[in-house]
């Protein structure tokens, strides 16, 4: 949400001023973050951790990832949920890889207004952040999750066939609202599905999958865009819609059961 409200409008203005400025400032942001990390006193790192943490830190990165992947594979509901989110992440990345070109060249929006358009979509995320708990309580977590995964998927397709920027903006608002609902409630599901003492390792392995496929999706999206800037959104939208339909019942059941804190063994029986 902050990315869309502040980052996107600022990047649009910078892009309009000089095409290299967004990239320069983005790199500068990483540099500043690295400086702050090095400014953390060493004694806080070496003496501020617990014995359990110290033991965990001795394990290699590969062994941690291996443990997480094994856990994900052996837990059927968690495995299917990760497979669903990974495939969605891949096609979302594919569909949005050339979004700025679609907006500026097909919808004919000036580059300096690109961020304003994204901020409008971000307002849907803000509204969802306020309403998601109420919607979940009123309609049930499973219902909201299932509807959110479908709406956030099919809106990708609708964006690809948008005739003008106004329609695109409205669809973007709806999409951001649905995606934020999905993300908030999805994290609640993970907190039930993954034991607290293992959450870091399992969640890290999950993110390795989800974020690992996104650059590949973006690359393929760029290739597809050579056939037309609408194509990535249309292809990605069709794929995400089919994935959401295939996962609709699973997500509905999973959401309702995790809202009761239930995982073993009923979730495995219904997966």
What are these regions (language model features)?
Residues 9, 81, 98, 184-185:
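Transmembrane alpha-helix boundary/hinge residues in polytopic small-molecule transporters
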Residues 16, 40, 70-74, 92:
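Residues at helix-coil transition
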Residues 37-55, 180-194:
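Juxtamembrane interface at the ends
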